[in-house]
């Protein structure tokens, strides 16, 4: 999500010129990361170890979730942002999809289809349908 000066702490406002000099003016101000696995329960969130308080990781699937099958997902990004950071988000700046085997030495393959932003996350999740109208 874009950096929002009006929502930034004093310290964040002091640091921002350095962040922009090192990483660019469009460097996100807040980051939500949805992950499969981890030690927390599904739905729980925790501070992103790479971004500190500016990022939140949210567990979507537990270790041991069946492989080789489609897993429809729907999230309420707006509410997750509010829960994580305490204020309303502006429109997202970037969407990234990736996978990481956490240095396990394994090879993995995954696919994504029907990625979309909808007015309501509950409509597609309840039917398992990954298409949007």
Regions from the PLM with identified roles:
Residues 67-105:
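Extracellular beta-strand ligand-recognition surfaces/modules
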Residues 27-31, 39, 60-77:
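Trp-centered recognition loops
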Residues 44-68, 80:
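A mid-sequence, solvent-exposed acidic-amphipathic segment
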Residues 123-133:
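A cross-kingdom marker for long, charged
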Residues 1-53:
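Extracellular/luminal beta-rich ligand-recognition
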Residues 4-8, 103-108:
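Short, surface-exposed beta-strand/loop "edge" segments at domain boundaries and coil↔beta transitions
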Residues 95, 110-117:
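Extracellular beta-strand elements of beta-rich domains used
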Residues 2, 114-123:
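Short beta-strand-to-coil "C-cap" segments at the C-terminal boundary of structured domains/repeats
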